[in-house]
Amino acid sequence: MRLVFGEKDTPYEEARVVVLPVPYDLSLSFLPGARRGPEAILLASRELEPFLLELGAAPEEVGIHAAEPVPWVAGMAEESHRLIREEALRHLRAGKWVVALGGDHSVTHPLVQAHREALGDFSLLHVDAHADLYPEWQGSVYSHASPFYRLLTEGFPLVQVGIRAMDRDSLRLARKKGVALFPAHRIHREGLPLDEILRALGKRVYISLDFDALDPSLMPSVGTPLPGGLSYRQVVDLLEAVFREKEVVGMDFVELSPNGQFHAEMTAAQLVYHAIGLKGLQAGWLSREVDHI
């Protein structure tokens, strides 16, 4: 059987990258199932070609270890978030680069907290269909609609790309707090403003990507799909630019809700694997075997 994200089994002690499954979705407000996202991505990753032609390298060669899923406590959001933060922190303190697989988008808050505790300050790049800036949703501050409100109040600089749904209060908050907003409709009309996005980010960046940033024609298996999303090429171009120009301290990919359409899981797995390869090239763990293809 092919192993996840490549053909090489990298022991934890030797791995540079830890893929951390976070199968938590207690805060979803529409379609359920994001708790099955991590397992579906890992299963799909077994079918990927280890060598990525576009990168001219095989990301598996950085040394990838898939950790055990983070446990969570039914009906106890605060305790579940504590467990997520502590598990991420454990891997970070061991010197690993962590890419987390959600789960709903509420998991980003404890993941980012763990990264700041371990690594210091950085800015946030949030790629999503939704702004996720509600102070609370359906009575909970731990909602998947609220993580970036909480992170803003904790002082994180925020850049949002691909947004298609945002209420008036969230827009006012974003303007007040200096959020750099690059909505999907502008990207479709004017092109992807990479130079502006890069200027808005700090030198060190944490990336959080909700799969519903992609158009539902490409990524139907999400909890809250919206038309008018980004293409796979636009997302890859964005990631390549950020990894090329910035130090990416960590990532999460969230909100895949498998519904039997396996092409969505394959797309998600390919995107995660590509990002790991970009980190490998950025950090010098990989070198391009082939240029100018």
From Swiss-Prot:
In T.thermophilus, the biosynthetic pathways of spermidine operates via N1-aminopropylagmatine without the production of putrescine. Involved in the biosynthesis of polyamines which are thought to support the growth of thermophilic microorganisms under high-temperature conditions. It seems that long-chain and branched-chain of polyamines effectively stabilize DNA and RNA, respectively. Catalyzes the decarboxylation of N1-(3-aminopropyl)agmatine to yield spermidine and urea. It cannot use agmatine as substrate. This is N(1)-aminopropylagmatine ureohydrolase. It catalyses: N(1)-(3-aminopropyl)agmatine + H2O = urea + spermidine. Pathway: Amine and polyamine biosynthesis; spermidine biosynthesis. Binds 2 manganese ions per subunit. Mn(2+) 1 binds at residues 105, 128, 132, 210. It is found in: Cytoplasm. It comes from Thermus thermophilus (strain ATCC 27634 / DSM 579 / HB8). It is an enzyme of class 3 (hydrolase). The keyword DNA-binding does not apply. Mn(2+) 2 binds at residues 128, 130, 210, 212.
